[in-house]
Amino acid sequence: MENHTIIIGYGVKGRSAAKALLDAGYNPNTIVVVSPDRESCDLATRDGLVAFVGDGRQEEVLRDVSIERAGQIIVATNEDDTSVLVTLTARRLAPADAKIIAAVRESQNADVMRQSGATSVIPTAESAGRLMGLSVISSAAGALMEDLLDSSRGLEVTERAVTKDELSMSPGDLNEKGLIILAIIRGGITHRFYTESIRFLEQGDRMVVIKYNRDED
């Protein structure tokens, strides 16, 4: 197995992450779940994923799921201290360019998680609280964010390569054609739409865009 995705923890966060990957077209055979809970692993197997019963903090367990060849690791345990230990071990064993995406319950632990080697850190409790607050301030804005978070319907945030027909066009040209561009990725650097630092699209550029999932119809 190579360039696969390892999900450590298969509670609500882990299952939601797996669903997002499957909705995006990932092959379920390339998603490996690691959990010390056999029932969670049985559930992952029923979902069509590869499952391994074990403690993600242990080096031998991560080696058993070929972490040295993984493309990305999702750390979705229920406790921040456990997630830090998992992330430390994963970062040491995984390829240098492997992404490690970790969830934290408390936002004050985000810096520790990054120092442990996480590429991206998601503060779950704070994010949920912000969404609830936004829904109170504006029910329409809250509904829109909820829509974006549900990859199976409506609007969806996705990343894709610039097509041949889009080369030499400006982001503004594509916006006029109805494409909503959030960012351009060039040379590994993300340029957000409001910086206006990208004048024309080039070969190798990637775009983060909002698209409409027509499966809703």
Show where each model-derived region lies.
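Cytosolic regulatory regions of ion transport systems
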Residues: 1-217
